[in-house]
Amino acid sequence: MVDKISGIVISVRDYSENDSLIKIISPTIGINTYLARGSKKTKSSLKIATQLFTYGDFFGKYPKKNGLGYLNSSESTSIFKNISLDIILNAYASHIAELLAAAFDENTNIDQWYFMFFQALKKIDAGLDPQVIANVFEIQLLSVFGVEPNLFSDPINGQTEGEFDFSEQYNGILSKKNYHLDDRRLHANPKAIYYLRMFSKIKISQFNSINISENVKRSLQRVINLIYDRQIGLKTRSRTFIEQMNSLQIKYPNDSSN
């Protein structure tokens, strides 16, 4: 019996001269790896269908426990074209996919996260800021990793509105009145903390446009990276690539050919 796997291709690796290993995220069985037989052959129906960030229906066999599934054919597939053509958009989309793969075991029903991921890819492909979309995922996935910083109120006085900074010592936000209690608070941009809090509960589908300054985005990313580095111990390969690209842009901001 042939199984139907509906989902999004999030990883493609060479396996043999004619075959590839394809990782697909699906709402019902989560993230799994499949052997795409003959996908590297010129006339294979899977050649185009198994490109990165292609989505649709694939046919083959579900993976057995601790094993590979396989794919023989596909149907009604499409691709997020702009993501596939732009190295930066691709990197942010891959970063989100790597976070999801780290957060969930294989064969896990993750329908909520799957549809959130699909919405994220649509937004990135349509031109919304990929860093902002990735930040929403980074923040909302924290609880899945077992990390839940307090982003809703100052733990000392219960303050929920006003200016805040992030404190490792208090594992969350600290109001301006209590800055003196933590000399090692992050000194983050107050607007970055505002977005940190907002992104913890916003839905991707609510984003139609958003404009955040580069300084605020850098400050927000610094807070998020600190949490992932020190409390989770996770740094994706795509995040490393993004940081390398960002450092080049800072080093050569006006480099152009005439």
From Swiss-Prot:
The keyword DNA repair applies. It comes from the Bacteria. One of its GO terms (biological process) is double-strand break repair. The keyword DNA damage applies. GO terms for cellular component: bacterial nucleoid. Gene3D superfamilies: Nucleic acid-binding proteins, Recombination protein O, C-terminal domain. Keywords: DNA damage, DNA recombination, DNA repair. Pfam families: RecO_C, RecO_N. InterPro entries: ARFGAP/RecO, DNA_rep/recomb_RecO_N, NA-bd_OB-fold, RecO, RecO_C. Transmembrane segments: none annotated. Involved in DNA repair and RecF pathway recombination. Belongs to the RecO family. This is DNA repair protein RecO. It comes from Oenococcus oeni (strain ATCC BAA-331 / PSU-1). The lineage of its organism: Bacteria, Bacillati, Bacillota, Bacilli, Lactobacillales.
